[in-house]
From Swiss-Prot:
S-adenosyl-L-methionine binds at residues 184, 207, 230-231, 244-245. The gene is omt4. The lineage of its organism: Eukaryota, Amoebozoa, Evosea, Eumycetozoa, Dictyostelia. Belongs to the class I-like SAM-binding methyltransferase superfamily. Cation-independent O-methyltransferase family. COMT subfamily. PANTHER family: O-METHYLTRANSFERASE CICE, PUTATIVE (AFU_ORTHOLOGUE AFUA_4G14580)-RELATED. One of its GO terms (biological process) is biosynthetic process. It comes from Dictyostelium discoideum. The keyword Electron transport does not apply. This is O-methyltransferase 4. The active site is at 248 (proton acceptor). InterPro entries: COMT-like, O_MeTrfase_dom, Plant_O-MeTrfase_dimerisation, SAM-dependent_MTases_sf, WH-like_DNA-bd_sf, WH_DNA-bd_sf.
Amino acid sequence: MEREENIEIKNSFDYILNSVTGLIESRLLYILVKHKVPEVFEDGLPKTYQQVAEKTQTSPIGIYKLLRYFTTSIGLFEEDLNNLGTFKKTPKSSLFTSDKYATFVEWCNNDLAYNMMKSLDLSIETGEPQCHKSLGVNSWWDLIKKPGEEEFFKNAMKVSSSEAIESALKFIDFSPFKKIVDIGGSHGRFVCEILEKYPNSHGINFDLESFFNGAGELIKNPRLEHKSGNFFESVPEGDCYILKRILHDWKDEDCIKILETIGKSILPGGKVIIFDCIINPKNYNKGHLYLDVMMFHFFGSEEKTIKQFSNISDKAGFKIDKVVNEIPNYCLIISKKD
């Protein structure tokens, strides 16, 4: 009986330990991608930790601890048990390379991200977004207007949405649309990929003037225009509007205003395609709830249920036509009510 109790206590402590190590693990992930450790293994050959340290300009003892940790915790590497200190890649490690999700991982775990979380307790206590208070700015939007931050943020979001873009091109038919407007489209990648698949369509990448001024080179296509503006004031005319990870930044009343603005410009028979998480109260998803907390802390907004989307659409003069479940985190297609 005593032995069983000891096992239970040990398992309980392991559970607690696994629950409280997120801080150090996320920071170690930042270090991993900052020094491009996964890239070192992309040739598929085993490496000693000394070789990895030399290539990444880190200390041998430090990189050994890093490799060993991620071999054990999330299976990024494998250590040769017959030649300890020699590691090789796994399929998971490739996800953390620069051409995959490294930029997103870095943005989520860099110094700025850690500072943003210092006031999370205030958001929970007050019920209002307090992220800006730990950063010395008036709002989260002021933060990303700082030199370099908006571009870094947009690049991170671009990487994180790759899977959604691929799925959208697979499961949504854009052929009926002649003019596709991507609201908050950043560099224009999404709408450009749509145009490549649908040669009879034209596109408009619509974003803030402040972003275009600091965005560097935008994606070019003879059938693509880049236009600046404010979606609370007006948007270009089109028969298809894309809202990818836009509405979750805003409270319901602001979402209604955005859709009302689109409603003034949308052509007859047009559609609005919304890419956002859909919270299912009967089957919660940890990733959705993580984003829900972040949106609350940053903006006072949230990830929404299908009921909320229905109410928002209805009040803005739209109706839900379809939920596309095949797309990661889901997608809604809405149109103007008759």
